[in-house]
Structure formats: structure tokens, C-alpha cells
Amino acid sequence: MSSGFSHMDGDGSITMVDVGDKKDTRRTAIVRGKVEMAPATLDMLVKQALPKGDVLTTAKVAGIQAAKRTWELIPLCHPLFLSYVDVRFTVDESLPGVVVEAEARTTGQTGVEMEALVAAQVAAMTIYDMCKAVQKDIVLRDCRLVYKSGGKSGEFRAC
């Protein structure tokens, strides 16, 4: 029984993909998401006037740490040697809120999409955590892979 899913064996049971015979290639993944909040909350974030301190620096560190621990959080992910992880933020008053962008890179046998996704989501959740004292209805949305390269499937760019 072939499901087409790489994490299922012939019997339909889950399995960790064997990447042992795959060639090492340079791999990159970029993920983007949004954290929407009230203009007043965004203003406090920009002015570093929130009770918990410097939101974006804390969120950046949290996202980078999370990327490095992805294999511990997602059951069938491989532990990877990440050569680069970054989390970047753009304040967007038209949202209003913050656009979170996470990038992960490696040279290896499997991709870094999950690491970039986890980095972006944890960074966004950290922004929520640090702002929730002044606003509870902050919205995390539209987190998605926008670019990947490397491996057998090659390059992907979201429309």
C-alpha cells in the first residue's frame, strides 16, 4: 500500500524517512508569518515600553533556539546541523503588527523547512507572550513557507 507520504511505510505505519543514501546539498528555507495587534500595542512594542522588555530581541533568540530543537518537537524530524538560522522582523503599521521572517540553512541530506517554520512560529508566539499583558486578542496568522532550495525537489517560491 503506497500512500505517497514519505513518512509512511508499505503497511501505512509511520516511519522516519531513511535519508542515508541521499546526497548532501545546500538547503535553505524561508518562512513568513504575521502578528497582528492594536496600533497602541504596536507603538509600545516599537518604543520598547512593554512590561516584559525588548520584545523583538527576545523573540529573535526564542526563534533561533526553537529552530535548533525542532527535531525534539516534531516526532519524525531528523536532528540537523544548522549552518545558519536568523529571524527578522518588519514593523508594518498597515497590519498593524509585525511580519516575522525566519530563515534556516544547512548542507545535508534533508531540508530545513520545519526548522524555519518552528522558528517563525515560536518567535511569533514569543511576541504574543510579551505583549499579552496589554492586549489579549493578538492574532498570529499566515505563517507559510515562502522559499526553499536544495534537494531533489529543487527550488520553490510561493506566489
From Swiss-Prot:
Protein keywords: Lyase, Molybdenum cofactor biosynthesis
Binding-site residues for substrate, renumbered to this chain: L76, C77, H78, M114, E115
Pathway terms, separated by semicolons: Cofactor biosynthesis; molybdopterin biosynthesis
Subunit structure: Homohexamer; trimer of dimers.
Function: Catalyzes the conversion of (8S)-3',8-cyclo-7,8-dihydroguanosine 5'-triphosphate to cyclic pyranopterin monophosphate (cPMP).
NCBIfam families documented for this protein: moaC, PRK09364.1
Protein name: Cyclic pyranopterin monophosphate synthase
Taxonomic source organism: Oleidesulfovibrio alaskensis (strain ATCC BAA-1058 / DSM 17464 / G20)
Phylogenetic placement of the source organism: Bacteria, Pseudomonadati, Thermodesulfobacteriota, Desulfovibrionia, Desulfovibrionales
